Amino acid sequence: MEKREELYRGKAKSVYKTDDADRLILLFRNDTSAFDGKRIEQLDRKGMVNNKFNAFIMQKLEEAGVPTQFDKLLGDNECLVKKLDMIPVECVVRNYAAGSLVKRLGIEEGTRLNPYTFELFLKDDAKGDPFINESHVVAFGWGTAEQLVRMKELSIKVNEVLTKLFDDAGLLLVDFKLEFGVFHGEIVLGDEFSPDGCRLWDKDTRKKMDKDRFRQGLGDVIEAYEEVANRLGVPL
């Protein structure tokens, strides 16, 4: 597989074309951002940890029947993925109140949500990733009603699989975001799954083990990521 020119550079990953029109290379960088890219720092080992963490999670999801873009690891910081036609919508599943939900509704952080909540946000940093609903997605042509049904089904399946996986490792899966795209007509899970895009708390102490450590200035960000990976058995 030949790596070619950079196609896209995001806040923490770079995407490269390959000699296969259906495949891309994701490069996980050490960049760490918060507040829609307004704060960016370099954290040693972060790209490696997130790349291998993502590979582990995507493989677990594939085994559970969730189609993903992940193909294989290429190195410490790179993986090969399917080239998706991305849907510009973030699906957020929440099992406990945290983050923007607490700010929007004034709910106490850590409140158990039973059942979980499912939310949609437009993927647009310039607009602050606004909260949207299903009718917006269809009306503005960001996706179809059928695609939304499948995205929700897969989000719920991901929640079922990963809630148990993290629980077995002594962790609470507080919330997470997912992005989907289309590959040869099929809705497929894209982007990544790492502590950058979810909230994980220690089940006993409620210690935060995710990017909130960076957002809130708690320190030991990568140490927390590595502890989560080690609890899950991710080979780093």
Swiss-Prot record:
Transmembrane segments annotated in the record for this chain: none
Gene Ontology MF terms: ATP binding; phosphoribosylaminoimidazolesuccinocarboxamide synthase activity
Superkingdom in the source lineage: Bacteria
Reactions that this protein is recorded to catalyse: 5-amino-1-(5-phospho-D-ribosyl)imidazole-4-carboxylate + L-aspartate + ATP = (2S)-2-[5-amino-1-(5-phospho-beta-D-ribosyl)imidazole-4-carboxamido]succinate + ADP + phosphate + 2 H(+)
Family to which the UniProt record says this protein belongs: Belongs to the SAICAR synthetase family.
HAMAP family according to UniProt: SAICAR_synth
Name this polypeptide is given: Phosphoribosylaminoimidazole-succinocarboxamide synthase
Originating species: Pseudomonas savastanoi pv. phaseolicola (strain 1448A / Race 6) (Pseudomonas syringae pv. phaseolicola (strain 1448A / Race 6))
